[in-house]
C-alpha cells in the first residue's frame, strides 16, 4: 500500500466515483455541497437525502455502497493492475479540465497525465482517405516534434494516425477512451496503445472493464477538446462525431482549425462546413505551432548545402518535383528526401500532389 492511509482522500474519491446507479450529476452535487468524498462517506442516508439534488434513492445507494466497498482492498486491486486514478480533489487533476462546465469527477489513467503545456487535439474520420492519413501523420509529427502534445481518441483512421505521427516526431500524445481504461478499442491498435502509454498516457472517465458504448464517445469528446488549446479536424462527413468535438471546443472557447477539401468529397463536407462557419483554414501544421508560440529551435538552424539548393529555387509559386529536379540537378529519390526534411521544419509546403512552395 505504500504511503496510502485511511486519511488519504483518494480512497474515498475512488469509492465515490464507483457507486452503482449514482450519476455524474449527483456526484458533482455531492462534491459541491460536501467538499470531499470523505465527507460524503461519513454522512448518513438521511443527511444525504436532505442535500439539494440528491434523491432518497440515491442517498440509500450511497449508504449501501459503503457496506459493500472495501476502501483498501479495492484500491490495492486497482494499483496492482497498473492503473492510476485522480479526482477533482487531487492537485494533480488536469488544470484544463477543472474549467469545464461538466468536468469528469474522476479519471483513470495509464502512463502520465497530460502536462500543463501547449497541446492540440487531432480528430477526424475513421474511414479516412489516403490523403487524410498523410495529413494526420504529417500534422501529428509536426506538432510532436515542436513540443505540442497531441490529444486524440485512439479511434481508427485520423485519430490513430495523429497519435502515430506525434510518436514519430518524438513528442507526447494522449488518448482519451470511450470505454474502460484497460480495454484496447479498436483491438488492432494494441501496439499503438502500448506506445502511447509509454510516451504519454491513456485516459478514461469510465472504470476498468467497462465495454465501449455509442453513448460514451460524445462524452469523451468534451475531454479531448478540454485538454487541448486548439482542435484540428482532418476529414469529417457532414454528420460526424468530430463535429461534436468541434462544438465542444467552441463552447469551451478553444480555437478550431479544419483541413479544407474538395466540394465533391463527402469526407470533406464536415470540414468545409466548419470553415464556412468561421473555423480556421489549416494550410500547414506550422500555423498551429506558431499560434501556440512554439516554433522549434531546429527551424532556426542553418540549412545544409543540398537543402539550401532546394529551398533557394522555391518561392510562393508552386513548382513540380520535375521542375525542381531540373533546376537543382538532383535525382527524384534524393529530392523527395530533402523536401520531406524541409517540410518537417516548416520551410516548404506541398500545395497539391508533388507541387511545392517555400513558407518562410
Segments from the language model and where they lie:
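Glycine-biased, small-residue-rich flexible motifs in mid-sequence functional cores and linkers
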Residues: 2-7, 87-360
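Short, small/acidic-rich helices and loops at N termini and domain boundaries
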Residues: 1-91, 321, 345-355, 359-360
Amino acid at each position: 500500500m505504500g504511503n496510502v492511509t485511511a486519511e488519504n482522500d483518494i480512497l474515498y474519491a475512488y469509492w465515490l466515483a464507483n457507486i452503482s446507479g449514482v450519476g455524474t450529476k449527483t456526484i458533482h452535487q455531492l462534491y459541491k455541497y460536501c467538499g470531499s468524498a470523505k465527507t460524503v462517506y461519513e454522512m448518513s442516508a438521511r443527511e444525504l437525502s436532505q442535500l439539494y439534488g440528491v434523491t432518497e434513492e440515491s442517498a440509500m445507494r450511497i449508504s449501501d455502497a459503503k457496506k459493500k466497498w472495501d476502501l483498501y482492498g479495492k484500491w490495492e486491486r486497482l494499483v496492482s493492475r497498473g492503473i492510476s486514478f485522480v479526482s477533482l480533489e487531487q492537485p494533480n487533476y488536469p488544470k484544463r479540465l477543472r474549467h469545464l462546465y461538466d468536468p469528469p469527477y474522476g479519471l483513470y489513467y495509464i502512463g502520465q497525465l497530460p502536462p500543463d503545456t501547449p497541446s492540440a487535439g487531432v480528430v477526424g474520420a475513421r474511414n479516412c482517405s489516403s490523403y487524410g492519413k498523410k495529413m494526420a501523420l504529417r500534422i501529428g509529427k509536426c506538432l510532436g516534434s515542436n513540443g505540442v502534445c497531441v490529444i486524440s481518441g485512439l479511434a481508427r483512421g485520423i485519430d490513430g494516425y495523429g497519435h502515430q505521427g506525434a510518436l514519430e516526431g518524438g513528442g507526447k500524445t494522449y488518448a482519451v477512451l470511450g470505454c474502460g481504461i484497460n480495454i484496447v478499442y479498436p483491438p488492432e491498435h494494441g501496439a499503438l496503445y502500448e506506445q502511447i502509454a509509454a510516451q504519454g498516457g491513456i485516459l478514461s472517465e469510465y472504470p476498468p472493464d467497462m465495454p465501449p458504448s455509442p453513448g460514451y464517445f460524445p462524452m469523451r469528446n468534451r475531454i479531448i477538446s478540454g485538454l487541448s488549446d486548439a482542435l484540428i479536424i482532418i476529414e469529417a462527413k457532414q454528420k460526424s462525431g468530430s463535429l461534436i468535438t468541434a462544438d465542444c471546443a467552441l463552447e469551451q472557447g478553444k480555437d478550431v482549425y479544419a483541413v479544407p477539401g474538395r466540394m465533391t468529397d463527402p469526407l470533406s463536407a464536415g470540414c468545409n462546413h466548419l470553415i464556412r462557419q468561421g473555423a480556421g483554414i489549416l494550410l500547414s501544421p506550422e500555423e498551429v505551432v506558431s499560434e501556440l508560440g512554439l516554433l522549434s529551435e531546429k527551424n532556426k538552424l542553418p540549412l545544409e548545402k543540398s537543402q539550401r539548393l532546394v529551398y533557394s529555387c522555391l518561392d510562393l509559386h508552386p513548382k513540380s518535383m520535375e521542375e525542381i529536379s531540373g533546376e537543382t540537378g538532383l535525382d527524384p529519390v534524393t529530392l523527395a528526401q530533402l523536401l520531406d526534411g524541409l517540410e518537417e521544419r516548416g520551410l516548404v509546403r506541398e500545395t497539391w500532389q508533388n507541387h511545392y512552395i517555400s513558407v518562410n
